[in-house]
A protein has these predicted regions:
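Short beta-strand to alpha-helix junction loop
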Residues: 94-114, 244-248
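N-terminal Rossmann-like FAD-binding beta1-loop-alpha1 element of flavoenzymes
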Residues: 3-31
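Active-site-proximal substrate-binding core of FAD-dependent oxidoreductases
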Residues: 308, 327-378
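Predominantly flavin-linked oxidoreductase catalytic cores and closely associated redox partners
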Residues: 115-265
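N-terminal FAD cofactor-binding segment of flavoenzymes
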Residues: 25, 35-81
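Conserved Rossmann-like nucleotide-cofactor binding loop
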Residues: 14, 37, 162
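FAD/FMN-dependent oxidoreductases across multiple families
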Residues: 215-223, 229, 248-324, 341-343, ...
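C-terminal auxiliary extensions adjacent to catalytic cores
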Residues: 372-431
Length: 431
């Protein structure tokens, strides 16, 4: 007889929700986390689209450690000496059914893990899982952690993008470097009123701000800023291969240092104290690098299943992880009740994902990673073009005024009208 009905590896969003669903159904479930606490090994820019969480915990707003409701969307094209920003807000963004929030993964993940434990899940922290155990038929039947072997009817892997256990469990090729990015982030402590004033936010409301161009020194990637209640999260994500293949590429940590000094950013964090520094690998390939989601006795969810998309204007992953964790937990319960946790018995998980927004979204944007990877002009050409156009419009030096088209067309032609049309066509196809 197995030690547990289910073992969940990883106490992140997918793992804690999967463990919660299993425990709520009365199953014996063990959640194993290599960090000393839930969230210790997790990093995010900081934005949670809350629709998935609301399906698990309808009243989460009353108890979850949320930072601010995001009510401002800002997107910037940057050069070293300029910044062009679109700032959007609407009543729809404040609607509870469509709300998103900034979060800090440490406190948020601990709260979510506590919900699983309160439901009856057992959790152990500070324990890395070294490998999986298989029975004589090859079915996954547990984990090995140090000298201990712990068995279960089903194992759910939610241990992140660089999951060696996932590669062991379902045997797939490691994602190419072109489909993986690395992110670094710092959290700057400021008082609540100062953040409201500097970011032009009402109390309790916040901004999500994405930067393209000089934020990554012209290579594939971008910068981000999220307002927390009493801090600002600022970071950079850059493609690993783009950095490695670019001559004299700037290290990612230096990109962040330079972003902090940019004229558009420096005043916002002036006088702030750095209270956190973190790094994380980010899956950028979407469904193109997604491994098999099930095997005999095993399921994958969250980053270990590469459930993430970066559209340039929007980054999503946490809502996918929560939804996948919920479906993994629910389908594991059904498989346990049916007495069949083979690959065939776990097929319901894949079917549920196929019918959900998770795989529908990832399939919809299957061409986007390749488009963004080769969209060099977004990270170097267009920021310069926009800067020059804006300068031609707003800089007054006493010279006679010339028609706008005479100022703008030479700038556009330097970029190449056919190049612009090609990029628009590619964006329409990919997005």
């Amino acid at each position: 007889m197995a030690d547990f009905d289910a073992i969940v590896v990883g106490a992140g969003l997918a793992g804690s929700v999967a463990a919660y669903e299993l425990a709520k159904a009365g199953k014996e479930v063990l959640m194993v986390e290599r960090g000393n606490f839930a969230g210790a090994k997790n990093m995010t820019g900081g934005r949670l689209y809350a629709h998935s969480l609301k399906k698990v915990f309808p009243d989460f707003e009353k108890e979850a450690p949320l930072e601010r409701k995001i009510c401002h969307e800002r997107i910037s094209l940057m050069t070293s000496d300029s910044n062009f920003t679109i700032d959007f807000s609407s009543d729809a963004m404040e609607d509870e059914s469509q709300a998103s929030y900034s979060v800090l993964r440490g406190p948020f993940d601990q709260w979510l893990a506590s919900k699983a434990e309160d439901a009856g899940a057992e959790a152990i922290y500070g324990i890395p899982v070294e490998s999986l155990i298989r029975d004589e038929s090859g079915k996954v039947c547990g984990i090995k952690a140090g000298e201990d072997e712990i068995t279960a009817e089903v194992v759910i892997l939610c241990d992140g993008v660089n999951s060696l256990l996932a590669q062991e469990a379902v045997v797939y090729s490691k994602p190419p470097a072109s489909q993986i990015a690395v992110g670094v982030k710092e959290v700057f402590e400021l008082d609540e009123q100062t953040i409201d004033d500097r970011l032009l936010c009402n109390p309790g409301e916040g901004a999500a701000w994405l930067f393209a161009g000089d934020a990554t020194h012209g290579v594939f990637g971008g910068g981000f800023m999220y307002t927390n209640r009493t801090s600002i999260s600022l970071g950079v994500v850059a493609g690993i291969q783009a950095c490695a293949s670019t001559a004299n590429a700037t290290p990612v940590y230096q990109m962040l240092e330079d972003l902090k000094k940019h004229p558009a950013v420096a005043p916002l964090i002036k006088g702030a104290k750095v209270v956190e520094h973190s790094g994380h690998m980010v899956p950028e390939g979407g469904i193109n690098i997604m491994p098999p989601l099930i095997g005999d006795g095993v399921m994958l969810a969250g980053d270990s299943a590469m459930m993430c998309i970066n559209l340039g204007y929007m980054v999503r992953g946490m809502d996918y992880a929560i939804a996948a964790g919920q479906m993994a937990g629910q389908q594991a319960v059904k498989a346990l009740d049916a007495g069949d946790t083979s690959k065939a018995g776990l097929q319901g998980y894949v079917d549920a994902l196929e019918q959900s927004f998770v795989l529908k979204d990832l399939r919809q944007y299957k061409d986007e990673p390749a488009f963004m990877e080769n969209f060099d002009r977004m990270f170097n050409g267009y920021p310069v073009m926009v800067r020059d156009i804006m300068n031609s419009m707003f800089v007054v030096d006493g010279s006679p005024v010339t028609p706008m088209k005479r100022n703008v067309m030479p700038i556009v032609k330097r970029m190449g009208i056919m190049n612009i049309l090609k990029d628009v066509r590619g964006a329409m196809k990919a997005l």
